[in-house]
Amino acid sequence: MSDAATRRLMKELAQLKSEAPEGLLVDNTSTSNDLKQWKIGVVGAEGTLYAGEVFMLQFTFGPQYPFNSPEVMFVGETIPAHPHIYSNGHICLSILSDDWTPALSVQSVCLSILSMLSSSKEKKHPIDDAIYVRTCSKNPSKTRWWFHDDSV
């Protein structure tokens, strides 16, 4: 990892640890050992379908971060059922691929995912979940997403 990427990640991590927005939980054990991979908990907002539920996001940073997006996916025993989240934890969200810009941060990605969860009207995986999970790469960054529905 480049020095610039390391400095950027250290700055983002320090900010998250000191000023984590409501609904985000920084897993100190995962982030302190290795800057290349972080785990951050997201807590469903009150008044939403996911109220009080806790889900774990895993961020994996490549050597070109922040010029290339991190690999972001849900991990652990509980993957949220959502029309843009596959049962293997992969997330169909444009800012994780085509719309990524170095101005985005781990915090902004987490808040976008929380917003996506909060606006959902039903708990169900995408209609192509079974096929996708059977045939996809383990790395969600290698998926060529087709963004066709931004209403959830």
UniProtKB/Swiss-Prot annotation:
Domain UBC core: 4-152
Active site: 92
Keyword terms, alphabetized: Ligase, Transferase, Ubl conjugation, Ubl conjugation pathway
Family to which this protein belongs: Belongs to the ubiquitin-conjugating enzyme family.
Pfam families associated with the record: UQ_con (PF00179)
Annotated crosslink Peptide (Met-Gly) (interchain with G-Cter in ubiquitin) location: 1
Encoding gene (name): ubc-16
Keyword Phosphoprotein recorded: no
Keyword tRNA processing: no
Entries under PROSITE patterns matching the protein: UBC_2 (PS50127)
Family matches, as SUPFAM superfamilies: UBC-like
Domain of life the protein comes from: Eukaryota
Pathway where this protein functions: Protein modification; protein ubiquitination
Known role: Accepts ubiquitin from the E1 complex and catalyzes its covalent attachment to other proteins. Together with ubc-18, required for the ubiquitination of membranous organelles, and the removal of paternal mitochondria from early embryos.
Its EC number(s): 2.3.2.23, 2.3.2.25
Gene disruption phenotype: RNAi-mediated knockdown does not alter the ubiquitination of membranous organelles (MOs) or the number of MOs. Double RNAi-mediated knockdown together with ubc-18 reduces the ubiquitination of MOs. Double knockdown also reduces the number of lgg-1-positive autophagosome vesicles in embryos.
Name used for this protein in its record: Ubiquitin-conjugating enzyme E2 W
CC annotations in GO: nucleus
Record's catalysed reaction(s): S-ubiquitinyl-[E1 ubiquitin-activating enzyme]-L-cysteine + [E2 ubiquitin-conjugating enzyme]-L-cysteine = [E1 ubiquitin-activating enzyme]-L-cysteine + S-ubiquitinyl-[E2 ubiquitin-conjugating enzyme]-L-cysteine; S-ubiquitinyl-[E1 ubiquitin-activating enzyme]-L-cysteine + [acceptor protein]-N-terminal-amino acid = [E1 ubiquitin-activating enzyme]-L-cysteine + N-terminal-ubiquitinyl-[acceptor protein]
GO molecular function: ligase activity; ubiquitin conjugating enzyme activity
UniProt-listed GO biological process terms: proteasome-mediated ubiquitin-dependent protein catabolic process; protein polyubiquitination; protein ubiquitination
